[in-house]
Amino acid sequence: SSGRKCFSVSPHYSVSIVFDAEGDVWYNGKNTLYFMKEQSMYEETTIAAIATAPGEGGIGIIRLSGVSAAEIADKIFHTGKIKTFKEAVPYMMYFGHVTDGEKRIDEGLAVYMKAPHSYTGEDVVEIQIHGSAEALRETLALALRSGAVPAMRGEFTKRAFLNGRLDLAQAEAVMDIISAKGEAALTQAESHLSGALSGFVHGVMEELKDLITKLEVTIDYPEEDLEDLTMEETGDALEKIDKSLSALLKRSEEGRVIREGLRTAIIGRPNAGKSSLLNALLQEERAIVTDVPGTTRDTIEEAVRISGVSLLLMDTAGLRETDNKVEQIGIERARASMEKADLILAVIDGSSPLDEEDKEILHSLVGKKAIVILNKYDLTPEVKAEDIWEIAGHVPVVSLSARYGSGMDELREELRKITEKQDTDAGRILFLTNLRHVELVRKALDNVLRARASVREGLQADFIVIDLTEAWKTMGEITGDTMDDELIHSIFSRFCVGK
């Protein structure tokens, strides 16, 4: 009924789900959820946007997509090679000029991509001109006056989704590629775009769908006495799904590191050389370095890439007892950074014996992923690795001079050992790098665990089907097979205009 969402699973699955909500009919054919009203709107409109980043550049691109893309391009881009873009050889570049009446705006190249073999699945024309902000603005304005409408955030990718060119997980991977902070993040995003995550999700959905079908047979035909055999099969199948989802969730923290970078806190007492170390790693003067203890009072964050993985370096205030209120706030932030860090670089002044503040810092490293740096080794060394291991356990210890750069290669090698695993794994193991996906897999796993408990307790098949159906629906939200339009809009609104 209108205003109520109805959910059903067909035994034949030619139409997997049907919703009737607020008068909108949605259905799932293969992998794509089609929103009928939106598709109808898209069939009538052609969108345009600047597809390149703001600012000056060698090349700027205006992208058109929709039923009238070729006709609009005919009005604004003129070439002597063809009379109309409908006659163009698809994917071939044509030299010409963007003109507004008698006014020539710029010269450039244009390419026509015929539906459905384009990014959006629609007719697409891309016009490449010089990357002048003014030339791009005038060309876009000309396209809009010629019948195009401004593209919304992520609308090109949204059309690709609605036209079945991409599923939702692949669409989100496009954004991950754009924002990748390192080689490992790019590799994993490319894997998601190629369908690795979608293939996993659809595999789980097929297994759940098969179980639901078999259980519904026992409900519809109780006289066949199939329930005992079916329950045994269901228990075995659910154990397999449980292990599969659990393993993927366990790797989600590594996935976050691949996508966002390794949160690395640089800690130590005042004047140990933390800011000098940050500057040495960045190879630029980012932090102020003085002989005055307590100079750094706020957390400075910068990124550096090691072996394809981004390290988010956090230079923190020196850890010590102080009556200075401002410095106390900085120290509290330093401790907070240390707690949320994936890796700790503990800087010790190696030119003087360990004091109580040093020992307290070293004690705090027990059980954490850390590297101890004996700094100021250009002076007379007063601390040995054995002194560190006696307090902090067997952590890596690197002796160096951040001021003069000696020993920095050894530190980078230790960092490489840590980041190399993420970089290597990113190319061969599936990770969840998106928090939305993590939460959905966790929710689906909860449903699977409840279904397993119901099987063990001998509950009726009806109860098990409820949890399995919810798990199936939740997994479908990752690829967009079972999502509602509000969430779809929310996801694509995070994209930039022109993508």
PLM features per residue range, with description:
Residues 27-187, 191, 195, 371:
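A glycine-rich (often HGG/GG-containing) alpha/beta subdomain
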Residues 42-50, 54, 183-305, 322-324, ...:
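C-terminal-of-GTPase-core extension/linker across diverse P-loop GTPases
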Residues 95-104, 110-112, 295-322:
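Switch I (G2) and immediately adjacent beta-strands of P-loop GTPase domains
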Residues 129-131, 316, 348-351:
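Glycine-rich, N-terminal phosphate-binding loop of Rossmann-like dinucleotide-binding domains
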Residues 313, 347, 373-376:
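Generic enzyme active-site microenvironment
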Residues 329-350:
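Inter-motif core of Ras-like GTPase G domains
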